[in-house]
A protein has these predicted regions:
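Conserved catalytic submotifs in the C-terminal HATPase_c
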Residues: 23-26, 45, 50-60
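Short helix N-cap motif at coil->helix boundaries in the Bergerat
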Residues: 29, 110-121
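Conserved glycine-rich
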Residues: 152-153
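Short beta-strand/loop element within the Bergerat-fold HATPase_c
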Residues: 86-98
């Protein structure tokens, strides 16, 4: 757990650098999301949680592929960790005007309304006892917020206690960005 905390602090420090997208490339969103899902399959399997992926969006964004995968991974991993065993986590990617929306929906415990505005703060935990159980460091959502901001996007959450949560990461869509025409670098 200590090594995870140290790595997340390093990641967050890098995200706070002055020019976080110095090496920006065209990133195929579907490939990045699928890689993050693949990274979470073992964890999902240990909890008998099905990861359900919607259709591909066929778009790309300009950004840091590693950071985007890290953000997608953090959101998916949280959904798995905070969901009861034998449930589902839904993943979607959709285009909305000039944005690409990545959503993760779980059937977990939900987040109390009083905590919603604070969950993206560093080290903030809604339920410290549950975080000890899941191994959370309190940095994952802060990392997601920084990745979103560094890419000109944002992150939001809808949650209802006892019914789960939906996190939506919005990123500026690369104009005329069908993967066939732009490719990946």
């Amino acid at each position: 757990r200590l090594s995870t905390l140290v790595q997340e602090i390093i990641d967050l420090s890098r995200l706070q650098d002055a020019d976080p997208l110095l090496d920006a490339i065209h990133v195929d969103i579907d490939e990045a999301v699928n890689e993050a899902i693949d990274q979470c399959q073992v964890l999902a399997g240990t909890r008998d949680i099905d990861i359900i992926r919607g259709p591909n969006a066929g778009v790309s964004v300009v950004g840091d592929r590693t950071h985007l995968i890290m953000a997608f991974h953090n959101l998916i991993e949280n959904a798995i960790n905070y969901s009861p065993a034998s449930t589902r986590v839904g993943i979607g990617v959709e285009c909305r005007e000039d944005l690409v929306e990545f959503t993760v929906t779980d059937q977990g415990v939900g987040i109390p309304e009083k905590d919603l505005e604070r969950i993206f703060e560093r080290f903030y935990r809604v339920d410290p006892a549950r975080s000890r159980e899941t191994g959370g460091t309190g940095l994952g959502l802060s990392i997601v917020k920084h990745v979103a901001g560094n890419h000109g996007g944002d992150i939001s959450v809808w949650s209802l206690e006892g019914q789960g949560s939906t996190f939506t990461l919005r990123l500026p869509r690369l104009k005329d960005s069908s993967i066939a025409s732009t490719g990946t670098e």
